[in-house]
Amino acid sequence: MNPSPLSIHSALSSDALRIDAAAEVDRIAQAMRDQVRNKMRRRGLVIGLSGGVDSSVCAALAAYALGAQNVFAIFMPENDSDPESLSLGQEVAKAFSLEGAIEDIGSALAAMGCYERRDDFIRQVEPAYGSGWSCKVVISSPLAGEGYALSTLVLQAPDGSQTRHRMPASVYLGIVAATNMKQRTRKQMEYYHADRLNYAVLGTPNRLEYDQGFFVKNGDGAADLKPIAHLYKSQVYQIAEYLGVPEEVRRRPPTTDTWSLTQTQEEFYFALPYDRMDLCLHALNEGLGVEETAKATQLTTDQVERVWLDIHSKRKATRPLHLAPLLVQPVF
């Protein structure tokens, strides 16, 4: 019997999530063809390319499954975007011969008040915040043993000095609500192109993001299919190498590219770098022991238990993001 492309090693180690990339690519491509052509009866796929490894792998899979001529890539910079995101996204499109378009959403976001609303909330904790300033939100690590993650607002003044601010809940929620306009506006643009082409929209979350609710509802969480949601981030990198995703993309640290200050996903949401988070999540899912997990991740047993608690907490807190609209009674 041939092993499953997602079969794993029995012992937890850095190799625990190794996969047969070729077999897994074929399996995903077959599923994508069936979903797009038979289940949804669409001609192709639209994808927002961010210059990150997840969207790049999904674009490569789409081209492999349906042909590059049936994939449309969209690049959607805004006022806070890192210019590298656009250049890397375009490099990916070129590597896989994808047609695409640049849709700068900065003016649309400004017209809706995205930036001004965010800045108004920031000024509740730092009245001087304005032109020339930059910001990001970071969380405390659950490894610190505080029991829950605290969000901190980091501000950089025009002279380069940085300050950290605790936020009232209303300020935090207001900043996040304004910032979430970015993901929702991008998704609106993706569906515009999907509608005009009779294409489906391709979602790009990996398993860690999907499991932990690291997405905006009706924003980057909205899609018609999500072909890598079962793959750990470590496995996405294996697929990226196999499919020939440009090395510059594979070397780039995972980033939200949402805030005007550079911010990693680890700073904003996850407790650890993705490779160790993957192992902790896999160990929890498979019911492996805390001692084995600690050895594989180079954490203490107390730290592993804190990471697992954080995983459970995020699953509970973000469960509503996964729910379809609730009905009083079934309709279909």
From Swiss-Prot:
GO terms for molecular function: ATP binding; glutaminase activity; metal ion binding; NAD+ synthase (glutamine-hydrolyzing) activity; NAD+ synthase activity. It catalyses: deamido-NAD(+) + NH4(+) + ATP = AMP + diphosphate + NAD(+) + H(+). Deamido-NAD(+) binds at R184, K217, D224. Its EC number is 6.3.1.5. Keywords: ATP-binding, Ligase, Magnesium, Metal-binding, NAD, Nucleotide-binding. Belongs to the NAD synthetase family. Catalyzes the ATP-dependent amidation of deamido-NAD to form NAD. Uses ammonia as a nitrogen source. Homodimer. This is NH(3)-dependent NAD(+) synthetase. It comes from Rhizobium rhizogenes (strain K84 / ATCC BAA-868) (Agrobacterium radiobacter). The gene is nadE.
